[in-house]
Amino acid sequence: MVTPGNIGSFTVWDYLVFALMLLISAVIGIYYAFAGGGQKTSKDFLMGGRSMTAVPVALSLTASFMSAVTVLGTPAEVYRFGAMFIIFAFSYTIVVIISSEVFLPVFYRLGITSTYEYLELRFNKFVRLLGTILFIIQTVLYTGIVIYAPALALNQVTGFDLWGAVVATGVVCTFYCTMGGLKAVVWTDVFQVGIMVAGFTSVIIRAVVVQGGIGPILNDSYYGDRLNFWDFDPNPLKRHTFWTIVVGGTFTWTGIYGVNQAQVQRYIACKTRFQAKMSLYVNLIGLWAILACAVLSGLAMYSIYKDCDPWTAKFVSAPDQLMPYLALDILRDYPGLPGLFVSCAYSGTLSTVSSSINALAAVTVEDLIKPYIRSLSEKKMSWISKGTSLLYGAICIGMAGIASLMGGLLQAALSIFGMVGGPLLGLFSLGILFPFVNSLGAVIGLLSGFAISLWVGIGSQIYAPSPSSSLPKPLSLEGCNFTSIESNWTSTVMPMMTTLIPETQVSSRPELADSWYSLSYLYFSTIGTIVAVLVGVIVSLLSGGLKQNVNREFLLTSEDFSYLNVLFSPCKEKGQEEKVEVLNWKARRTDNDMEQGTDNPAFNNMEMTSTEKGEKTNGITA
């Protein structure tokens, strides 16, 4: 039996494996900095050219948000609370369908670089500016968390200075992102997904061998109440149930995959709309695989430590250190494998941070610089894009300090996306799904949704949820083999009561602490989205939104569903078409366009003009 507290340490082979991962990542960045003549324009840097295909983009989509937060946080979540997290597989499926069928058609059709360009096309510049600012705040905070996560792992298993690791993480990914642009980010993500799967696989296989097969792991998990998949309790105060994960998780992750710049920027870079959609659906397989690996790792961790919990015994100082502790514990006799797992966690972060930096650079250049400084040449814009990437890399390193104060990494990360991503999802939904929503409704809806989600999110951080809604499952110390411990435990079985509220603070808790502030963190996004949509719709109806004529190119239409177009197009009769505006793409193809070819308007030099139905543009009737 594995005995906690007596783990090995990093060897030369582990450091070599880890260094090799960093070296390959950096080399990819250097290669794409100079391949094909380098990053000559901001489009080359931010959009990766014009010929990305589905599979590498799909793997990049998977890697971008399956970060070290997933590698470290999800197994610890399963270890403490059970395998309910596997229900996210349903959420991911719904999210991919919504993203590919609702949001992708509109963004791809318009050929935009920044998703927030859409907000100006559909509403006005002020709405675009609001959306951009919220995205920057959200992404910088989240990136700080995912930089801190692998540094924590390195600190635990190698003794490497925590903040030295934070700086190293930020510097490495900022380097290859700044050098190679989106192409470097995508292809480095492909490599790093492989490292993530390999790291998880090494831990799972060794755990199965140690425990004598998968059967004992599942048996221990069953009797330890970790196989709690089907909790249909509708109580929104319970941290994880089927409904909080499927409903709340769907809203949270749609805010990421449907409208988040880091993800949209990738599938917009695909050379055809079919390739873009395929990238999302292939990415779904990757999400399932990483989720399954993380959950199985958590169950294996419980089976191994069910009689001696390393956290309760204070062998680790935080739940997010449990997974690297397990890796070094069971892989200590196999030089190089502990280094592979740390590379796994590190790869998740490098992919996420580089994606975030590239997205931050894109929205800053497209939304905050280009609209106001139009005289800059493409070469200067390319250098500005690289400089912006470097700046955001430094900012995100600084923001990692906040992550050390936010508690559990997984919940902190998803909470940020919920509080900010929910209202933004509501804003884009207003524009794409509701033709009568006007700029006033969009602004008030966004601000209302953000205020509500921020209220509940900050309240939940100040006032911990009640123990009944978030109490981890019991863990034992009865199998520990130690003679002394720096604690005052007197029982051999000790549940981890980390969320209990000191008695001295109970009287100071407001009434909302056990209701509104105790909502599951997964509902933060749901609340923000629903409030933004409802308020936006009501304000628009009251302010004359029904009188406006919105360009159909900015809306989701039946033509965006090919099967609906086939079914209903024969039913249309001549003379019944409405008088609507359409966009006319005046493509000015360059020689490079003709050489490579693409049906994605994002990569053509074009002018957009508005023409009414029946008028002619370039000899073509609209």
Curated annotation (Swiss-Prot):
Residues 1-15, 73-83, 150-161, 206-241, 305-336, 411-415, 460-521 are extracellular. It catalyses: (S)-lactate(out) + 2 Na(+)(out) = (S)-lactate(in) + 2 Na(+)(in); propanoate(out) + 2 Na(+)(out) = propanoate(in) + 2 Na(+)(in); pyruvate(out) + 2 Na(+)(out) = pyruvate(in) + 2 Na(+)(in); acetate(out) + 2 Na(+)(out) = acetate(in) + 2 Na(+)(in). It is a multi-pass membrane protein. GO terms for biological process: acetate transport; chloride transport; iodide transport; lactate transport; nicotinate transport; nitrate transmembrane transport; propanoate transmembrane transport; pyruvate transport. Residues 595-609 have a biased composition (Polar residues). In the gastrula and neurula stages, expressed in the gastrula anterior endoderm and in the entire circumference of the blastopore lip superficial endoderm. At tailbud stages, abundant expression observed in the ventral midgut region. As development proceeds expression becomes restricted to the liver diverticulum and ultimately to the presumptive gallbladder, by tadpole stage 35. Also present in pronephros and the tip of the tail. CDD domains: SLC5sbd_SMCT1. It is found in: Apical cell membrane. The keyword Membrane applies. Residues 591-622 are annotated as: Disordered. Keywords: Cell membrane, Glycoprotein, Ion transport, Membrane, Sodium, Sodium transport, Symport, Transmembrane, Transmembrane helix, Transport. Residues 37-51, 105-128, 183-184, 263-283, 358-389, 437-438, 543-622 are cytoplasmic. The chain crosses the membrane at residues 16-36, 52-72, 84-104, 129-149, 162-182, 185-205, 242-262, 284-304, 337-357, 390-410, 416-436, 439-459, 522-542. GO terms for molecular function: monocarboxylate:sodium symporter activity; organic acid:sodium symporter activity. It comes from the Eukaryota. Glycans are attached at N219, N481, N488. InterPro entries: Na/Glc_symporter_sf (IPR038377), Na/solute_symporter (IPR001734), SLC5sbd_SMCT1 (IPR041992), Sodium:Solute_Symporter_SSF (IPR051163). One of its GO terms (cellular component) is apical plasma membrane. It holds the Pfam family SSF. PANTHER family: SODIUM-COUPLED MONOCARBOXYLATE TRANSPORTER (PTHR42985), SODIUM-COUPLED MONOCARBOXYLATE TRANSPORTER 1 (PTHR42985:SF10). NCBIfam families: sss. Belongs to the sodium:solute symporter (SSF) (TC 2.A.21) family. Acts as an electrogenic sodium (Na(+)) and chloride (Cl-)-dependent sodium-coupled solute transporter, including transport of monocarboxylates (short-chain fatty acids including L-lactate, D-lactate, pyruvate, acetate, propionate, valerate and butyrate), mocarboxylate drugs (nicotinate, benzoate, salicylate and 5-aminosalicylate) and ketone bodies (beta-D-hydroxybutyrate, acetoacetate and alpha-ketoisocaproate), with a Na(+):substrate stoichiometry of between 4:1 and 2:1. Catalyzes passive carrier mediated diffusion of iodide. This is Sodium-coupled monocarboxylate transporter 1. The lineage of its organism: Eukaryota, Metazoa, Chordata, Craniata, Vertebrata. The gene is slc5a8.
